[in-house]
C-alpha cells in the first residue's frame, strides 16, 4: 500500500517540517500532502519542498475551489509540477464549507456539485492544451459572459506546456459527490473514512465508474484516506489529544445547519455525540465539547498504541480496498513502523 504524509497547513507562524518530509522520502513514502483553510495556502509550500526532494509526489489535500478560478489552480499545479521535474504533483481539490467560501473568499456557495464538475473539466482542458479553453457550465463558464462582462474575452491556450495527465483527486464525502469523484477524477481523498464504511461506499464508487464509461473501475483509481499514527503505551492519552481537533471541526468548522464534519460523524453512527459536541461548542463550552468526543470515534480513524496494537489494527486498513494511506504523525519511529507495514 502506498503511504502519504500529511503536513497540513501552518498555524500562526509558517513552519514546514522539512526533516520529516525528507525522512518520508528516504523511507519510500509515495506522497506528501499540504492543506489550506484561511491562512497558509496549499500550493506555495509544495514549490519549496519540490526543490528539496527528488521523488516523492506532492499533493494538495486540498486546494479549496473558491480560492482560485480553475485556470489559476491549473496554472499553479502545472507550474509546481514543472519545477519538480514533471509527473510529481497531485491536484487535490475540495469545496470547503459555506462559512469559508462566503466569509473568507467572498464567493457564493452556489451549487457545489456542479462547481466541482465545471472546475475539473476546465482544469483538464488547461492541462491537455488540445484547443483554446472554452467551457459552458452550470456554475462556471469560460469566457466569462455574466454581469459586468465587456464581452471581449476569448478562449486561450496555456503558454506553458504542462503535464497533460496531471492527476486530479477530489476530497468528497456525500453520496452525490463520491459518485462524481469516481466519474471524473483520478483519485479520491475520502472525508470521514474508516475501513468499516467501505461496503457502503463501494456501490457509490461503482455507480460513478459506470457513469464515466470506457471501462473505468477500481483498477488505476486511487483511494487514499488519512489516519493519525502514534506509538504509545497510553492509548487513552493519544485519543484525548485528537479530541480538540474533532470538537473544533464537528462543532465549529461550518454553520449549525451545514457542517460536513458533523454529517460525517453522524454517518459513522455517532449522531447523538455529534449533536452534543456542536451544541457545547457553539455555546462556547469548548472543554465540555472536547470531553463529549467518544474515544471510539477517534480510535477507529487512527492507529495509536503499542506497536503490536498498531500492527494488528493496520490490517483492517490494508484489506478494505484502499490503495494508499496518508498518515499524520510527529514520530519518526511511527513513520518507520508504517513503512515496514506497507511493504
State each model region's role.
Residues 1-343:
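Active-site-adjacent structural elements that line small-molecule/cofactor binding pockets in enzymes
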Amino acid at each position: 500500500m502506498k503511504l502519504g504524509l500529511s503536513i497540513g497547513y501552518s498555524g500562526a507562524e509558517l513552519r514546514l517540517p522539512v526533516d520529516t518530509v525528507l525522512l518520508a522520502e528516504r523511507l519510500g513514502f509515495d506522497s506528501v500532502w499540504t492543506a489550506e483553510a484561511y491562512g497558509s495556502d496549499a500550493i506555495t509550500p509544495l514549490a519549496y519542498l519540490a526543490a528539496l526532494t527528488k521523488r516523492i509526489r506532492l499533493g494538495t489535500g486540498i486546494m479549496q475551489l473558491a480560492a482560485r478560478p480553475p485556470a489559476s489552480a491549473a496554472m499553479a499545479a502545472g507550474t509546481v509540477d514543472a519545477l519538480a521535474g514533471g509527473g510529481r504533483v497531485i491536484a487535490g481539490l475540495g469545496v470547503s464549507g459555506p462559512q469559508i467560501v462566503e466569509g473568507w473568499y467572498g464567493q457564493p456557495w452556489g451549487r457545489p456539485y456542479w462547481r466541482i464538475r465545471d472546475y475539473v473539466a476546465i482544469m483538464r482542458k488547461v492541462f491537455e492544451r488540445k484547443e483554446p479553453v472554452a467551457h459552458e457550465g452550470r456554475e462556471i463558464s469560460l469566457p466569462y459572459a455574466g454581469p459586468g462582462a465587456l464581452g471581449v474575452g476569448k478562449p486561450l491556450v496555456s503558454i506553458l506546456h504542462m503535464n497533460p495527465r496531471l492527476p486530479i483527486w477530489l476530497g468528497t464525502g456525500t453520496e452525490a459527490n463520491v459518485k462524481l469523484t469516481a466519474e471524473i477524477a483520478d483519485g479520491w481523498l475520502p472525508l470521514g473514512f474508516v475501513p468499516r464504511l467501505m461496503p457502503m461506499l463501494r456501490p457509490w464508487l461503482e455507480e460513478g465508474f459506470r457513469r464515466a464509461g470506457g471501462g473505468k473501475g477500481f483498477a488505476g483509481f486511487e483511494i487514499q484516506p488519512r489516519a493519525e499514527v502514534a506509538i504509545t503505551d497510553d492509548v487513552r492519552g493519544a485519543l484525548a489529544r485528537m479530541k480538540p481537533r474533532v470538537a473544533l471541526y464537528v462543532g465549529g468548522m461550518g454553520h449549525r445547519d451545514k457542517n460536513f464534519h458533523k454529517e460525517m460523524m453522524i454517518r459513522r453512527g455517532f449522531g447523538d455525540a455529534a449533536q452534543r459536541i456542536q451544541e457545547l461548542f457553539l455555546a462556547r463550552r469548548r472543554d465540555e465539547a472536547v470531553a463529549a468526543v467518544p474515544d471510539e470515534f477517534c480510535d477507529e480513524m487512527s492507529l495509536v498504541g503499542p506497536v503490536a496494537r498498531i500492527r494488528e489494527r493496520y490490517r483492517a486498513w490494508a484489506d478494505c480496498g484502499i490503495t494508499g494511506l496518508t498518515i499524520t504523525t510527529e514520530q519518526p519511529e511511527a513513520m518507520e513502523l508504517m513503512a515496514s507495514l506497507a511493504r
